Amino acid sequence: MSKRILAKQTAELIGQEVKLMGWANSRRDHGGVIFIDLRDESGLVQVTVHPDSKEAFKLAEGVRDEYVLKVIGKVIEREEKLINPNLETGTVEVVVETLGILNKSEPLPFAVSVGPENKEEQNVGEDVRLKYRYLDLRRPKMQHMLKRRAEMYAFIRKYMEANDFTEVATPILANSSPEGARDFLIPSRFNPGKFFALPQAPQQFKQLLMVGGVPRYYQFATCFRDEDTRADRLYGDFYQLDLEMAFVDDGEEVRELIDPLVLRLTTEFAGKKLTFKDIP
């Protein structure tokens, strides 16, 4: 047994020895038995350390929130009265045979973990969140947002490819072009006194693609603009779905492509009701 499994898989592996790795979400000492809620990218599972596993128990006594742990143990069913209906893995627990501390954690500047019974997250100022970004990214809300963004990207890719678009990543180091804001300039080491410009938009490149025989192009473009912060974008860089179509007679063809995409993104990812007549 050498392969690591995820917390959510434990419910299907009753009676088997498993290896888990993740963060200590919380630790409780109940009458000499130590319970640790182990968290990984799939969720939580309770691991139980008994005093007869002397080495593991000694280590478990010193475990604190956000310690990174390696657990080897046996999955067993919980007694009916101990089942936690608020937890996906609440019908099982892992009885620890071997416990390893992969990394310790200093006292936390804010709470990272959120228990299954408490869905509320601590209200933390943005300046603190950005200073400890690696901790902020562990919070359930941030994990959810990152996964939803990845799902949205996958949805858009599938939609664009179904409509015969080709995804092309265009260059980041380019020459300056007339756009609506100032360029970010990067000195060229090989050409003293010369500069690259970070693209405000991939306009020149997508026009080259149209001429070059790629009539339907798209990408998730990173755009760089030296302009004041706006309500819909941060200073410096932002991301957009960029696309171009050749051989189009009028705007109606573009609307027939974009309207269904906007409709589905709004309803499926923003959770808002929208109909075609709502789209201007």
Each model region followed by its residue ranges:
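Class II aminoacyl-tRNA synthetase catalytic cores and aaRS-like
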Residues: 1-280
